[in-house]
Amino acid sequence: MTTVMNSTETGILGTCGIDADGLATDLDTMASFPYTDKYSDFVCGAWKSCAVWNGTGQGLDAGLDPYEGPAVVTDLGERLPYVRHLVGELFDLSLLKYGRLARLTPGSALVPHRDYLELDTNLIRIHLPLETDESCISSHNTTLYHMNVGEIWFLDATQAHSAVSNWTKDRTHLVLDFQADSLAACFTGEVQSPSIPSTHQVARQPVDREELAAFERAGILMDTTNYRDFLKIAIKTMFTRDITPDGVFDLLEGAARHSPAAARLDMIPPMRRYFLLARES
């Protein structure tokens, strides 16, 4: 496996000026796009995506399928002049491999996971929030934070990360994946070292062991039709209580042990490995 050696962690890299009218026009256009739910197993709720740049030029090819050469603008990307202009000003497009719109729908929660496990190479991931709210929270390992429109964020996708949306609209981000030897190489200008400022961080309450035990006891109600509802509650608990990504799966597995249908919930124990440790390509 080729690994990008940059010893960086998730954090804000800087800000960029946003043309509010240009962005609003593109957001209106995005609202009419078709989207794929290719990664639906990674979300409780809905995480819709489409490609703005990829290797095929097809907007509904939103996966990370390997290919040679730089990315091309897709049929959907051709309809987003402001987004293309903004990305072209900020980044070296010759190193871009994938550019996707990611829309996290109201009330949804991403399963804590690590990316690139199924690939032969690690990529460098950048997030540009396009439409969001303070009630949309992301996580990097055990740190919670919020990203604002006009900010440029590096996401260390090799580390456990998640997100929840408590907003009434879709949280929309542009997610860019670069194949480069360093983070700095992806940009046309200078960028600061990534960090998560304290002003962006979100506090959690200490773990209450009785609350966690009560969640597990509620597993008596779990069956094959609702185990992902339990998963969603466990994920959202990570955004209010001081538990780890591993702790989310501890809660789910603990609840499953209380279920009368435990023997039929054999899909639960492999989930920790699939999301956090290893996936086949």
Label the model's feature ranges.
Residues 175-233:
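Charged, amphipathic alpha-helical linkers/stalks
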Residues 111-113, 136-138, 155-156, 160-167:
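Short beta-strand His + acidic residue motifs that chelate non-heme Fe in jelly-roll/DSBH
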Residues 94-96, 105, 121-125, 133:
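Short connector loops at helix/strand junctions that flank enzyme active sites
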Residues 124-129, 152-154, 168-186:
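A short hydrophobic beta-strand segment most commonly corresponding to one strand
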Residues 111, 129-149:
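A short beta-strand-loop-beta hairpin characteristic of the jelly-roll/cupin
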